[in-house]
Amino acid sequence: MTSIKTKVIHGGISTDKTTGAVSVPIYQTSTYKQNGLGQPKEYEYSRSGNPTRHALEELIADLEGGVQGFAFSSGLAGIHAVLSLFSAGDHIILADDVYGGTFRLMDKVLTKTGIIYDLVDLSNLDDLKAAFKEETKAIYFETPSNPLLKVLDIKEISAIAKAHDALTLVDNTFATPYLQQPIALGADIVLHSATKYLGGHSDVVAGLVTTNSKELASEIGFLQNSIGAVLGPQDSWLVQRGIKTLALRMEAHSANAQKIAEFLETSKAVSKVYYPGLNSHPGHEIAKKQMSAFGGMISFELTDENAVKDFVENLSYFTLAESLGGVESLIEVPAVMTHASIPKELREEIGIKDGLIRLSVGVEAIEDLLTDIKEALEKK
């Protein structure tokens, strides 16, 4: 079996079949010459298919163990297409601490189509089992989750879903296929914001989807073409280039994050740390079972919640910005940034406090990052 370290470089369509180019060319075209009337070649129109995009789609399917991949103009575009598989009256079980954009899409957009949902703490399998209705068609979750780094048992949840004839939809953005393989654990569809670790350089907005079912692939392909939120060739090329160094980057992100999380856990200025690599994390054992390392994301709370503003503004190497997964370190406050679309009462109920801080730990020298955090904590 080929190692994923090799697959990120050689997987999918790694060379151009026409010219032999080692880097897949950017086919910057909207349409394609046909052989004759009613005689199209492999590609007809770039919304329906583009060679550069197709190479990326083949790559994500290869990395995740899917039968077909799909590249979208953003992570949310991919989520929208997947959730468009469902119809009025269908019920979705949604993890209670999903990304704010996913919650907004479900709560403000998809409910208008008649889809219904319930927010459920999926770390409690009894709560999950109790949440099923006759109309339940799918379970949707992230693991690790954004921003509380909750680790959910993909194998157990997938088995429960199958017992209820429901699909398991896993957002694998935080872990990437390098650290975690949801399809191998029973998931039906895997989604990514490729803007994050797959792209890896904060220079592209993209979404990727893959599935282990030919039937689902056919339906998703129809929706991708019909909705039209496809990824352009330039951006497809950028994501492919980013994936080539995924193994190197994820190992560096994970190593740096582990050391920072361990430091934060010992700091008197910090009251709580959320990182799956810590023995104190409630999902640590599950993470060890289904992940090869623990990733580059950390969330934590300061002992003095009033010190949050000073802390985030006193850092030198952690840029205050939304998004995550680039080579540079970022910091944000979910309650007023990435998760502001979730009502305050609901945010607090699920544990996203106003003072929660989220770090996207980059690949800089660990001594510089630790010094930066220590000095900012002392200045606050």
Curated annotation (Swiss-Prot):
A molecular function annotated in GO for this UniProt entry is: cysteine-S-conjugate beta-lyase activity
Q: Which GO terms describe its biological process?
A: cysteine biosynthetic process via cystathionine; methionine biosynthetic process; transsulfuration
Name of the top EC class for this enzyme = lyase
Q: Which GO terms describe its cellular component?
A: cytoplasm
- Sorted alphabetically, which keywords does the UniProt record give? Amino-acid biosynthesis, Cytoplasm, Lyase, Methionine biosynthesis, Pyridoxal phosphate
The record lists the catalysed reaction(s) as: L,L-cystathionine + H2O = L-homocysteine + pyruvate + NH4(+); an S-substituted L-cysteine + H2O = a thiol + pyruvate + NH4(+)
Q: Which InterPro entries match?
A: Cys/Met-Metab_PyrdxlP-dep_enz, Cys_met_metab_PP, PyrdxlP-dep_Trfase, PyrdxlP-dep_Trfase_major, PyrdxlP-dep_Trfase_small
Named in its record, the pathway it takes part in is: Amino-acid biosynthesis; L-methionine biosynthesis via de novo pathway; L-homocysteine from L-cystathionine: step 1/1
Q: Where on the tree of life does the source sit, at the highest rank?
A: Bacteria
- What is this enzyme's EC? 4.4.1.13
Annotated protein name in UniProt:
Cystathionine beta-lyase
Q: Which organism is it from?
A: Lactococcus lactis subsp. lactis (strain IL1403)
